């Protein structure tokens, strides 16, 4: 079974925010998982009860200041962050992720509920699946591997991801030591 942070956040929203209005922060392509809640989506942030952050708006991919300004009047609302990663590599381009917006929201005293590695809710729900063999896969030592280490689950590090330059310069052993991380397996890439 493959279990994602998006699935974990969807379950949480069904249990806790089912009839609440939300403002979606992220590109339209990220919204497919949350179609169940489409009737509760509002286009004006002022009309929302909470904030659902899955990424950055396509027209504001490089400007975290834009989000601080947008969110500054809404710090009393909870933000649900569906991906705690701060950055992601898409091909050769490094981009901000939803976690960067969430951190910006916290910097202005907003409250964020994170779903995804390394935060416990995604593991608690995944471990409930009755699958006793859990392998956490990812390219980020700060989130993917740290979460696996905290939960004492096996992990597979994708070395061709965000740490590829560090690994190429320092060796995998030294990078793991620098991040105080342990892995069970590693490989360059993962193809579906």
Map each language-model feature to its residues.
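Asp-based, Mg2+/Mn2+-dependent phosphohydrolase catalytic module
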Residues: 3, 7-192
């Amino acid at each position: 079974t493959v279990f994602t942070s998006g699935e974990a956040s969807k379950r949480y929203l069904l249990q806790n925010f089912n009839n609440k209005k939300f403002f979606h922060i992220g590109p339209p392509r990220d919204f497919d998982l949350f179609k169940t809640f489409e009737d509760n989506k509002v286009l004006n942030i002022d009309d929302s009860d909470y904030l659902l952050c899955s990424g950055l708006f396509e027209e504001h991919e490089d400007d975290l200041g834009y989000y601080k300004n947008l969110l500054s009047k809404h710090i009393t609302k909870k933000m649900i962050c569906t991906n705690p990663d701060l950055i992601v590599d898409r091909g050769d381009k490094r981009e901000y992720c939803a976690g960067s917006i969430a951190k910006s929201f916290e910097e202005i005293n907003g409250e964020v509920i994170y779903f995804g590695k390394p935060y416990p809710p995604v593991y608690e729900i995944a471990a409930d699946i009755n699958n006793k063999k859990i392998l956490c896969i990812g390219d980020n030592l700060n989130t993917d591997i740290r979460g696996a280490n905290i939960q004492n689950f096996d992990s597979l590090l994708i070395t061709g991801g965000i740490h590829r330059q560090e690994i190429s310069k320092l060796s995998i052993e030294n990078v793991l030591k620098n991040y105080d991380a342990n892995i069970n397996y590693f490989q360059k890439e993962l193809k579906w």
